[in-house]
Amino acid sequence: MAERVELLERRVRELERELELARGGRASARARIETMSPEVTDSNPYSRLMALKRMGIVKDYEKIRTFTVAIVGVGGVGSVTAEMLTRCGIGKLLLFDYDKVELANMNRLFFQPHQAGLSKVQAAEHTLRNINPDVQFEVHNYNITTLDNFEHFMDRISNGALEEGKPVDLVLSCVDNFEARMAINTACNELGQIWMESGVSENAVSGHIQLIIPGESACFACAPPLVVAANIDEKTLKREGVCAASLPTTMGVVAGILVQNVLKYLLNFGTVSYYLGYNAMQDFFPTMAMKPNPQCSDQNCRKQQENYKIKEAAQPKQEEIHQEEEIVHEDNDWGIELVSETTEDELKAASGPVPDLPVGITVAYTIPNKEENLTAEETVAESEESLEDLMAKMRNL
């Protein structure tokens, strides 16, 4: 009975907060801005973003308002990712999460204590609308891994762009479990949807982002973690009273490099990373590109690989042009030759023994032999003359 009362009281507080936000939460929000302006004024939220265009980094920054991005998971990484894209002026955001804000989340970024009890997508939407009312938001408070919700999730990423009926430009995975990652992977492979995956380790000191283009790069099932490859139920790995570590610093770094990769991909500047890792212990950022697995367990991935091969074969082949190096001073009118100061016999004598190596392997250099009983040449002659006599001779020179 006590639990039921506590649940009802929490629900009442949640409804009161929603009512308060609906009444006055947006009163101080600025008016919508129809077009981005490079004008440098205190009231222009886009002036510093438009400076990227003036400095030659981005050709057409205003294009960002035409893009739609779906974010699955609005937790430590996803909420900060949504905030960054909102501040950058993205056209539309689709947010998917079924969890609620808890006080245990306060060690992370974005959410505030007074939002405890609200669903993450609702709390995020209220905050993000106040940050930038120019962005359109569509939120879904459900678990995408259930059958019905999965079908709806696929429908929204296929038809939920700014222009209804068009697919989103990018899907971002910011979830914290393999089941949800595999659900996103399955949907994107079936639809041919480009997406980016992100994650933070359980010890909170490393993370990664990965760009996945179906058929062109490895999907999440091509090289799955052990927990997926061995068909282990990850729920059995969690114990009562035990949770993963969480640092706002690591999550902020991962969210930052994820959004940076998103901006480079959408606005076509810089080099887009297929995989970028982060090791906080050594400040190490490894990068790599992973090719798809021809024996991938996902049949849609294998199908996308075949489609990509056909597409590549249809592209006209570009012939590589090899330029011959020009010979400088080909004519040697003066008969100049390069002569070594060391003869071959002297070189062999100075070289160390050549080790016994297999056929085809040679050494770049050998260790010189150590000559024994070497004495330095005498450069100082002994004399019975005094120091004063020697100084007098020096003055007379």
Swiss-Prot record:
Where's the motif UFM1-interacting sequence (UIS)?
327-339
Q: Which GO terms describe its molecular function?
A: ATP binding; protein homodimerization activity; UFM1 activating enzyme activity; zinc ion binding
Alphabetically ordered keywords of this record: ATP-binding, Cytoplasm, Endoplasmic reticulum, Golgi apparatus, Membrane, Metal-binding, Nucleotide-binding, Nucleus, Ubl conjugation pathway, Zinc
Catalytic residues at C243
Gene Ontology CC annotation, any one: cytosol
Can you quote the domain comment?
The UFC1-binding sequence (UFC) motif mediates interaction with UFC1. The linker region is required to activate the active site of UFC1: it region moves next to active site of UFC1 to reduce the amount of water molecules in the vicinity of UFC1's active site and thereby elevate the nucleophilic activity of UFC1 active site.
Which family does the UniProt entry place this protein in?
A: Belongs to the ubiquitin-activating E1 family. UBA5 subfamily.
The leader peptide range reads: none
Explain the purpose of this protein. E1-like enzyme which specifically catalyzes the first step in ufmylation. Activates UFM1 by first adenylating its C-terminal glycine residue with ATP, and thereafter linking this residue to the side chain of a cysteine residue in E1, yielding a UFM1-E1 thioester and free AMP. Activates UFM1 via a trans-binding mechanism, in which UFM1 interacts with distinct sites in both subunits of the UBA5 homodimer. Trans-binding also promotes stabilization of the UBA5 homodimer, and enhances ATP-binding. Transfer of UFM1 from UBA5 to the E2-like enzyme UFC1 also takes place using a trans mechanism.
Q: How does it assemble?
A: Homodimer; homodimerization is required for UFM1 activation. Interacts (via UIS motif) with UFM1; binds UFM1 via a trans-binding mechanism in which UFM1 interacts with distinct sites in both subunits of the UBA5 homodimer. Interacts (via C-terminus) with UFC1.
Name it: Ubiquitin-like modifier-activating enzyme 5
Identify the Gene3D superfamilies for this entry. NAD(P)-binding Rossmann-like Domain (3.40.50.720)
Q: Where in the cell is it found?
A: Cytoplasm; Nucleus; Endoplasmic reticulum membrane; Golgi apparatus
The record lists Zn(2+) as bound by: C219, C222, C296, C301
Chain positions recorded as ATP binding sites: G76, D97, K120, N143, N177
